Amino acid sequence: MRTQVAIIGSGPSGLLLGQLLAGIGVETIILERSSREHVLGRVRAGVLEQGTVDLLGEAGAAGRLHAEGLPHSGISLAFDGRLHRIDLTALTGGRHVTVYGQTEVTHDLMDKREAAGSVTVYETSKVALHDFDGASPFVTYDKDGATHRIDCDFIAGCDGYHGVSRRSAPEGALKTFERQYPFGWLGVLAQVPPADPELVYANHERGFALCSMRSPQRSRYYVQVPADERVEAWSDERFWDELRRRLPPRTAAAVTTGPSFEKSIAPLRSFVAEPMRFGRLFLVGDAAHIVPPTGAKGLNLAASDVRYLFAGLREFFSDRSQAGLDAYSAKALARVWKAVRFSWWMTTMLHRFPETGEFGQRIQEAELDYLVHSKAASTALAENYVGLPY
C-alpha cells in the first residue's frame, strides 16, 4: 500500500489530522492497535479551548459540538468554605471554553472519516517505523497473521505516551523532562445533574476536588487520592461522602448522588520529549507531552500540535516548501511548555502535597487569596485557561 501520510493512532489527534488533510486532498492511512470499540470507550478530557473548537470546525466535524457543547464563561475556585468565580469571558475580551467530552470528539471525527471512505486499520500489532530519516519512509505492521507495508511521504506519531512513535526516535536524539506527582485523581461518571453550572476547583485540607460535567444530565467528579490508591477501595457511597466533605457547604448540598457507571484512578505527571520531529517522523500530542489534567490542556495541546503540523504539511504538498515542517517542533514546543507551566501551577496551587506540610498549605491559601482579589492575577489564569494564542 501507499499513502501520503501514515498516521499512527486513531485518537482525536490522529483523526483530526486525517480530516484536515482529507479536506485538502491529501491521502492518509491510520493504524490503530486497539479495536474501534475500545477507542470509543476511552473516558478522557471534556474542556475545549476556542482554538480547538475552531479547528474541529475547519475539519467539518463540529456540527454536534455546536449543537450539544456547553459554552462556559467562567470557573470557580473553592477554598476557605466559599466559591470565588473567575469570569473568563470578561477577563479575556469575550473568549470562553466549551464543555464537550473527548469521547464525543472522537466519535464525530471517526464518523466523518468513515463516511468519506478513508482507511483506518484497527487491531494492528508489531507496528514499526522505517527510514524516516530519508525521503522514503515506510511503516510495517501485522494484521490477521500477515505482515503489511505502507510506503508514505511522512509519518505522524499520534499514538500516545505508550505508543511506538516516540520509542522509534534514534538513540540519543531524544531529551525528556518529567515530574511525577505523589497523588492521582479518582474520577467517577454518573448520570446525575452537575452540582454547579460551571467547573468548581476545590482546595481543601483533605485534598483537591473537582466538579465537572459532560452534559446537563451527566456529571464528572474527581477527588485527589494517594498515588498507590486502588479504585476497588472506593464504593460509590465512600466517594460521594468524601467529595462533599471537600466542597463548600452550598456546593456540597447541590451534589446529586447516584450510581457511577465509570470509576477510575489516573496518575498525574508532567512530561515533555524534545524535539518533536525526526526527519519525516513527527510526534503529536501525548506521544510527545503529558500534562496533569488540572489545567484542562491535554486534548487542547494535541489539537495545537495538529494545527502546526497540518499547516506545515499543507505548505509542503501545495508549494513543495519544507519551511513549515522545519518550524514544527520549535513552534509546538513553545506552546507546549507554556501549557506545562500552567498545568503545573494549577496543580501545585490546588492539591495537598504530603511533603510541604502546614507551610505549604499557608502558601496555597495566600496564593489563592491573592489570585481572586487581583485582576492582574485573575487575568493571567483566565488567559491560560481559555488558551494562549497559536
What are the residue ranges of the model-derived segments?
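Extreme N-terminal starter segment of soluble prokaryotic enzymes
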Residues: M1-V5
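Active-site-adjacent segment of FAD-dependent monooxygenases/related oxidoreductases
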Residues: G41-R44, E49-A116, H130
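Conserved mid-domain beta->alpha element of the FAD-binding
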Residues: I8-G23, L109, S264-R341, W345
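Glycine-rich FAD pyrophosphate-binding loop
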Residues: A22-V43
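Glycine-rich, N-terminal phosphate-binding loop of Rossmann-like dinucleotide-binding domains
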Residues: H38, D159-G160, V291
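Conserved FAD-binding catalytic core of PHBH/FMO-like flavoproteins
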Residues: D111, S118-L268, A273
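Acidic/histidine metal-binding catalytic segments
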Residues: H66-P71, E123, L247-E262, R320-A327, ...
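C-terminal helical "tail/cap" subdomain of flavin- and related membrane-associated enzymes
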Residues: A296, A311-Y390
